[in-house]
Amino acid sequence: MKRVFLVFSLLLFSAALFGQNLRVAVAANLQGVIKVLAKDFKEKTGIEIEPIAGSSGNLATQIKNGAPFDVFLSADISFPEGLFNEGFTTKAPDVYAYGSLIIVSTQDIGFENWERLLLSPRVNKIAIANPKIAPYGKAAEEALTKKGIWTDIQPKIVQGESIAQVNTYISTGVADVGFSTQSLIKDAEGKTKLYWKIIDPQIYTPIKQGIVILKATKQTANAEKFYRYILSADAKKILKAYGYGV
């Protein structure tokens, strides 16, 4: 009888531990930094984070369709605001970081006059994320439109479903250049040599990245802890190290 009770207790304990895992929908641009944030958060609270990455638009659609996420870290503010307006979140989103758009390549081709470079025969393929579902893709479209070359470069564009796919196109040489997030540079340290330039933030809408807790969560207390952590000075220090404005 004692043995049965012990086994039952262990099962309950294991279930409790498993129940601590927070499922966090994470914008693809955060795939590198979320590992560092999750490690730091676990050290502070003992709570395990299970990140599920994708484009912000696709993640928002999954949430509307009932995906079992607890928290959503978006690459913009509009997708979490939309979820709030439709009643999927516990409250309006907070901004946890500001993103920076870069043009980047594995080739040292010079970005002094990057718009002229994109029009030249030196560049055959340009990677951007789908502007409809990926905020950094939308920012790239805005910047290219502002420079007056969006229409002209259409035959060269290779579109990724998320910034992660764009980064793969860049690192594997599928694209000569691409538009990505500054956090890619930190992610690539010690792995891939990259040449890059920050795009003037005046030529695209500021990339405000928002966080929300989802009403569907069954772990409200832990979700609140993670929410507060992401807005804390410790998390901001990590995000800043990855090139985000805080």
Question: Where do the model's predicted regions map?
Answer:
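Sec-dependent N-terminal signal peptides
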Residues: 4-15
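Exported/periplasmic ABC-transporter solute-binding proteins
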Residues: 20-44, 50-53, 57, 61-65, ...
